[in-house]
């Protein structure tokens, strides 16, 4: 079976992949055989920093992390749209500028509305204020 030019171009990638996998395997085996396998009581506590822990490691967090994730997704999509608009500016012209301006304006109005509603207040005082309102 003849070797094509595309297969020849993939040979360096295959060599690099084999080298990387081999190096990872060697390092994992070295860590397994050279490291001490002693089980100590300190390895089973939540903080393995050499200090005796005080308090509970499993405390409830006050920051609503789901909001951070939603904000990240919204502004990440906004960045993708703006990047796509910027790369095709020559084709879109003024109508594209109007569309992206409206898009950013709607997002900013949504951010202002969220701010005014208290959606960005995450501290303990905000949690107490929400508890009093309900």
Swiss-Prot record:
Its main location: membrane. Signal peptide: none annotated. InterPro entries: NAD(P)H_OxRDtase_bac/plastid, NADH_UbQ/plastoQ_OxRdtase_su3, NDAH_ubi_oxred_su3_sf. Keywords: Cell inner membrane, Cell membrane, Membrane, NAD, Quinone, Translocase, Transmembrane, Transmembrane helix, Transport, Ubiquinone. GO terms for cellular component: NADH dehydrogenase complex; plasma membrane. It comes from the Bacteria. It catalyses: a quinone + NADH + 5 H(+)(in) = a quinol + NAD(+) + 4 H(+)(out). Its EC number is 7.1.1.-. GO terms for molecular function: NADH dehydrogenase (ubiquinone) activity; NADH:ubiquinone reductase (non-electrogenic) activity; quinone binding. It is found in: Cell inner membrane. It is an enzyme of class 7 (translocase). The chain crosses the membrane at residues 10-30, 65-85, 94-114. It holds the Pfam family Oxidored_q4. NDH-1 is composed of 14 different subunits. Subunits NuoA, H, J, K, L, M, N constitute the membrane sector of the complex. Belongs to the complex I subunit 3 family. This is NADH-quinone oxidoreductase subunit A 1. It comes from Citrifermentans bemidjiense (strain ATCC BAA-1014 / DSM 16622 / JCM 12645 / Bem) (Geobacter bemidjiensis).
